[in-house]
A protein has these predicted regions:
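C-terminal motif of bacterial Sec signal peptides marking the signal peptidase cleavage site
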Residues: 26-29
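Bacterial N-terminal signal peptides that target proteins for export
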Residues: 4-18
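A compositional/structural signature for long, glycine/proline-rich flexible linkers
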Residues: 31-493
Length: 493
């Protein structure tokens, strides 16, 4: 009897002790920072693997935020364009003195602006334009997908009103709206290009840009505006943070703006949550163990190395730009068909690394020249070059095409006596034709003489590269049936 009583008493003590320990663990967990809680459920090896995957997925998203911060949030930024939901344009002629943007585009002056369509859609109004003038509004979501275009190749050059809606708007198209385009994210970036025919056309382009406008749908309809959506607590951008552990704090914020995983991303988001990255936005790198912190740093380095390697390989493909920019569906197909990848994250990241906001292939492609026909680097201090188009083999473009020269060291335009930085199809009547009506461009540091100067693209006294731009490429250019001719060195035109 005494023994049984002793057993019962001790059993009660054990049960009580176990309950107290369990309660202490629960209370301790409640007071623990989310990041610290996560580290108990993940090994350093797992953390590094997830960090690498997160980096490749999130790199273009974080770089997109960098643009958002400098263009529309930080009014002290030299790149500040204006607030959200306001069209910001700059019609000007770029020269060698412009050093802020590398590989600048002299064909189509830009408008660049951010839109917040969380509370309600915005209505974009565009004027009627001459049928020969190319223009478009490239619309980019937070993932950096080109989810839609408004412009010459998609909607024509008639005047119109285009409704840009976020993921939560599901009403019918209002009367008076030309078309509706839908973003899967609540913030949208636009790169707007309007063709410039030459220096004498600049005032006309300015007038066209001034007539682009945005307004909330409720303003257009004359109805009461919906309740405002709280403004996010935008984190200040720190340059260089995209290359170290600070990256994960920005990714955590952007995951909050995304709100929920896209189709096919649930497993990735579950993995992100194991690092403490979630829509709640409570990631805390300092709360992680030293081992987990080092694992995340290693994941960043590993992820960036993979992005760099993929980008380097892509530069050897003249049609790379046609494969790495586009809609979500297009990039998913391209990843599988062209690169045998299950996900498109690496395509988006490599594209963001080499140049954010490239066009979808149907709008423009950019064959680039870094080497000559003998695969040797281009250097005008050693050689002159010719680029020859047969009469029936000009670049196949629905709108127009151009060839632009860049200094190989600065990646900028080259100072030259003609103030000429490109040759394009809008001045075809000015070019000198060969015996078989072929078109031969001359690329050299010295003038080929007055008679051939119309065909001369001045080069620096040193290394250079050139970029061909085809706006509205024909199927032959997209399929590879037409390929850009090679640059021949020291060949007389």
């Amino acid at each position: 009897m005494t023994q049984n009583l002793w057993n019962m008493t001790n059993t009660k003590h054990f049960i009580t002790l176990a309950f107290v320990l369990l309660l202490a663990m629960i209370l301790s967990g409640c007071n623990e920072k989310p990041g610290a809680a996560q580290q108990t459920r993940i090994t350093p090896a797992e953390a590094q693997a997830i960090a690498k995957e997160a980096y490749i997925f999130g790199f273009p998203i974080v770089m997109n935020y960098k643009t958002m911060w400098s263009y529309s949030i930080d009014k002290n930024s030299p790149d500040y364009k204006g607030p959200f939901n306001e069209v910001s344009c700059a019609a000007r002629l770029f020269t060698p003195d412009d050093k802020a943007v590398v590989t600048p585009n002299a064909d189509t002056p830009y408008c660049m602006f951010w839109m917040d369509v969380r509370a309600e859609p915005l209505v974009l109004s565009v004027p009627e334009m001459e049928p020969e003038r190319f223009y478009h509004f490239q619309l980019v979501d937070l993932y950096t997908h080109n989810f839609a275009y408004v412009g010459t190749l998609t909607s024509g050059n008639s005047a119109g009103k285009f409704l840009i809606a976020g993921p939560d708007w599901d009403a019918e198209k209002p009367i008076g709206i030309t078309d509706v385009v839908r973003s899967e994210t609540g913030f949208v970036f636009s790169v707007t290009r309007t063709q410039l025919f030459g220096p004498d056309d600049l005032d006309k382009v300015k007038a066209i840009q001034a007539s682009y406008s945005l307004q909330p749908l409720s303003t257009l309809l004359g109805t009461e505006a919906p309740p405002a959506v709280p403004e996010p607590d935008f984190p200040e951008w720190a340059e260089g943070s995209q290359f170290d552990e600070r990256f994960f704090g920005y990714l955590d914020f952007m995951v909050g703006l995304l709100g929920h995983p896209a189709e096919g991303d649930q497993k990735l988001w579950d993995d992100l949550a194991r690092l403490g990255i979630s829509p709640e936005g409570d990631f805390d790198f300092s709360a992680l163990s030293k081992e987990t912190q080092e694992a995340l740093k290693a994941g960043v380095q590993e992820g960036f190395a993979e992005i760099e390697a993929f980008a380097e390989k892509s530069t050897k493909d003249p049609l790379a730009s046609a494969k790495t920019f586009g809609t979500r569906d297009f990039l998913s197909r391209s990843a599988k068909d062209n690169y045998q990848l299950e996900r498109s994250d690496l395509l988006r990241s490599a594209a963001a690394h080499t140049g954010l906001y490239g066009n979808s292939a149907a709008e423009a492609i950019y064959p680039a020249y870094f080497t000559d026909a003998d695969k040797e680097p281009l250097d005008a201090s050693k050689h002159s070059y010719t680029l020859t188009f047969a009469r029936d083999a000009l670049p196949p473009a629905k709108s127009f095409w151009s060839l632009t020269m860049y200094d190989g060291k600065t990646q900028l335009f080259i100072d030259n006596p003609l103030d000429r930085y490109l040759l394009n199809s809008t001045t075809m009547d000015d070019y000198v034709r060969g015996e078989d009506d072929e078109l031969v461009f001359i690329i050299s540091k010295d003038s080929p003489g007055k008679d051939l100067e119309p065909n001369w693209l001045p080069a620096p006294d040193g290394p250079f590269y050139a970029v061909m731009r085809l706006y509205g490429p024909e199927e032959a250019a997209l399929s590879g049936d037409w390929t850009p001719p090679a640059l021949e060195k020291d060949k007389q035109p």
